[in-house]
């Protein structure tokens, strides 16, 4: 314990930045952590896990489309008597602190210039791109922290302790996000290169392959479980099709949004066309700059002496980023409509920051004027990032985010729903949305009549949210017929489906 205290004392600036990042997360979640479609399932699975009901999602069916890692953490908090909000607040603050300290630690290992390390660490601490993750009940905060920890462990000398930690981290990465094995494989490949000096290339490759293989055993069991439930490995997915250039363009614009401190997170149809022009231009500029810096690095590698650790961290960070971008673009076209926006690309935020910091640090500015100019630009850039984050944190903390926003929570229809008896069973054409309001039990949709019929309850209600097709025609598909209307406004209606002893199917003749 004393060693840890001394370690932190020697890195007081980094500790201060980490605490500042954690404080921003606290402020951003002051009125409640943000809630979205994914959140409803994460929370429902966590509560059902804690109550011994299995890993059931918001609609009461076994979850396959998302791994259970975050949900289990929420469930553990529930078992300890903590609310969902408090559990996630604590988790996200811890993740923010780990991410900042881990970034600084990696830069120290690489022996980066003190000022460059401070700029990079401050950017990670105050970037709105990360704050937007810390202000939601999402899997990204723990995933980012796990990636940073895995990078640190990979750089350790080969040994049983390192191998055991990598197995645990690789498994954890998968159970937090399905994309975990992509990171595990990237890290295992680079770890093979790192460990070859001790074991030789063949033995190192076999060792790291064995680590990866062992970590995939629980992954295989989970995927087989999913296949038995719905015939898929990771839930139903729909590819976007088209060219690989389309998601790569979106990624470039996302990089630009990181520079402008204006993260973009949209729906599944988000594309390059939805980004402001300034983020597009800056994103392309960032990619060109990284390419030039990498080219310069390789051209001058024989003339500039780099430490082994610096080269290793650059190789590790670059490989993780490159493989994940390639995988994400391929997945978007061939497997899943998941645009390469801020949320999708945040796992490689730290690796990319490390790449830029390591490459720019190789250029030594001999002119005092240039050094002062670089310092002034850095201060302005970081100040802009910090002010943007503070503004976002205050706004999120005051108003909430998405379905946790006060405007959404206090809608008249939602106030009415919150006053319904707690032993009621609810149905809706938007069950995940309603779950942000009704967290007492599963919310079934209009096609889950068998589950609705067998649910233990006293009375049933259906909350129908009004919506239209693209041509403006009202969408009434699956709306119950003959149910009495007990509440109505412009957003929707609440229908009385009668006692739970009655046959619910009578409303869908």
Show where each model-derived region lies.
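Membrane-proximal lumenal/periplasmic loop motifs of glycosylation machinery
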Residues: 28-37, 51-71, 79, 83-89
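Membrane-lumen/periplasm interface segments of specific transmembrane helices
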Residues: 204-291, 323-327, 384, 388
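Multi-pass, polyprenyl lipid-linked donor-dependent membrane glycosyltransferases
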Residues: 37, 65, 88-95, 119-149, ...
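Perimembrane helix-loop-helix junctions
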Residues: 2-4, 160-163, 183-216
């Amino acid at each position: 314990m004393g060693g840890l205290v001394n370690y932190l004392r020697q890195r007081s600036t980094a500790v201060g930045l980490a605490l500042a990042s954690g404080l921003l997360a606290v402020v951003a979640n002051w009125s409640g952590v943000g809630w979205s479609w994914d959140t409803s399932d994460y929370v429902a699975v966590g509560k059902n896990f804690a109550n011994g009901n299995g890993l059931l999602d918001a609609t009461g069916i076994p979850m396959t489309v998302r791994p259970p890692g975050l949900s289990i953490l929420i469930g553990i908090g529930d078992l300890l008597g903590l609310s969902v909000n408090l559990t996630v607040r604590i988790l996200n603050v811890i993740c923010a602190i780990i991410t900042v300290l881990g970034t600084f630690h990696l830069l120290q290992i690489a022996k980066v210039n003190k000022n460059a390390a401070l700029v990079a660490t401050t950017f990670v601490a105050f970037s709105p791109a990360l704050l937007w993750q810390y202000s939601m009940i999402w899997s990204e905060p723990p995933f980012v922290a796990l990636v940073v920890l895995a990078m640190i462990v990979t750089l350790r000398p080969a040994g049983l302790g390192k191998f055991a930690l990598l197995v645990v981290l690789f498994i954890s990465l998968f159970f937090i996000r399905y994309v975990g094995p992509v990171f595990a494989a990237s890290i295992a490949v680079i770890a093979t290169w790192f460990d070859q000096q001790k074991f030789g290339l063949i033995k190192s490759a076999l060792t790291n392959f064995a680590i990866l293989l062992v970590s995939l055993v629980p992954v295989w069991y989970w995927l087989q479980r999913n296949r038995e439930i719905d015939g898929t490995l990771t839930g139903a997915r729909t590819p976007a099709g088209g060219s690989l250039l389309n998601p790569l363009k979106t990624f470039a614009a996302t990089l630009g949004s990181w520079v402008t401190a204006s993260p973009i997170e949209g729906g599944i149809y988000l594309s390059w066309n939805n980004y402001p022009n300034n983020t597009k231009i800056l994103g392309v500029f960032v990619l060109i700059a990284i390419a030039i810096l990498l080219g310069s690095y390789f051209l001058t590698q024989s003339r500039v002496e780099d430490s082994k650790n610096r080269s290793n961290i650059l190789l590790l960070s670059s490989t993780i980023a490159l493989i994940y971008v390639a995988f994400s673009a391929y997945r978007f076209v061939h497997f899943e409509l998941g645009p390469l926006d801020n949320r999708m690309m945040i796992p490689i935020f730290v690796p990319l920051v490390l790449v830029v910091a390591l490459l720019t640090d190789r250029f030594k500015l001999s002119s005092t004027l240039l050094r002062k100019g670089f310092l002034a630009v850095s201060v302005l850039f970081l100040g802009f990032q910090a002010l943007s984050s503070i503004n976002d944190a205050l706004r999120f903390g005051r108003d909430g985010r998405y379905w946790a926003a006060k405007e959404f929570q206090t809608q008249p229809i939602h106030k009415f729903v919150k006053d319904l008896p707690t032993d009621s069973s609810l149905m809706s054409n938007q069950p995940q949305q309603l779950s942000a309001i009704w967290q007492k039990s599963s919310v079934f949709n209009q096609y889950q009549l068998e589950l609705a019929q067998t649910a233990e309850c006293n009375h049933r209600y259906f909350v129908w949210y009004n919506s239209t097709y693209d041509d403006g025609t009202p969408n009434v598909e699956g709306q119950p017929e003959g149910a009495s209307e007990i509440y109505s406004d412009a957003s929707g209606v609440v229908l009385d489906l009668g006692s739970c002893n009655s046959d619910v199917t009578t409303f869908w003749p």
